[in-house]
Amino acid sequence: MMKIITFKIPEETLLLLDAYAIKHNMNRSEVIRLAIEKLVVDEMKNEPVPRARVEKIKF
């Protein structure tokens, strides 16, 4: 299930986003999801997942 988010973006960036969307026959949401995936998901694939250190509780 996808969540709806709202954010502000500079008008110049929005114009570039729209131009990219038109060129690639995509809508704004598709372009934004692709950009986030490229930036965040691809980068995180190369980093280890942080894990919390948990110690046993002694009774």
Swiss-Prot record:
Gene Ontology BP terms: regulation of DNA-templated transcription
InterPro entries: Arc_rbn_hlx_hlx, CopG, Ribbon_hlx_hlx
UniProt-listed Gene3D superfamilies: Met repressor-like
CDD domains: RHH_NikR_HicB-like
Name of this protein: Uncharacterized protein 59
Organism of derivation: Sulfolobus islandicus rod-shaped virus 1 (SIRV-1)
